[in-house]
Amino acid sequence: MDIIKKIERENMRLDVPAFRSGDTVKVHLRIVEGEKQRIQIFQGNVIRVKRGTTCATFTVRKISDGVGVERIFPLNSPFIDRVEVVTQGRVRRSRLYYLRALKGKAARIKPRGRF
């Protein structure tokens, strides 16, 4: 088991900021098209974070042209250039699947205050 843990530790990313469900994040993705590389930004609310070692994932939801788009990102993916936390949200759940049914102002998340 020590060999497996050692390999997992070597493959983990340490440059990812701490974020949780309800936060608004910008995920900078490295896209390879032929020989060219470019960075594409996916900004939205984190609706789920699955912790773990190398298999950790997080789900980001955004509204694009009136259509909800969700994308699941592996946290240790080499295609993720960086993750920025834009705002921190105050929520009482760890899984925000109820946002799928809400539209407009009802789908807003309150900002987390400093108390």
UniProtKB/Swiss-Prot annotation:
Name this protein carries in UniProt: Large ribosomal subunit protein bL19
The UniProt record lists the keyword Ribonucleoprotein: yes
Record-linked Pfam families: Ribosomal_L19
Keywords, sorted A to Z: Ribonucleoprotein, Ribosomal protein
Alphabetical list of NCBIfam families matching this protein: rplS_bact
Annotated organism of origin: Desulfovibrio desulfuricans (strain ATCC 27774 / DSM 6949 / MB)
Family statement drawn from the similarity comment of this UniProt entry: Belongs to the bacterial ribosomal protein bL19 family.
Job of this protein: This protein is located at the 30S-50S ribosomal subunit interface and may play a role in the structure and function of the aminoacyl-tRNA binding site.
Regions annotated as coiled coil: none
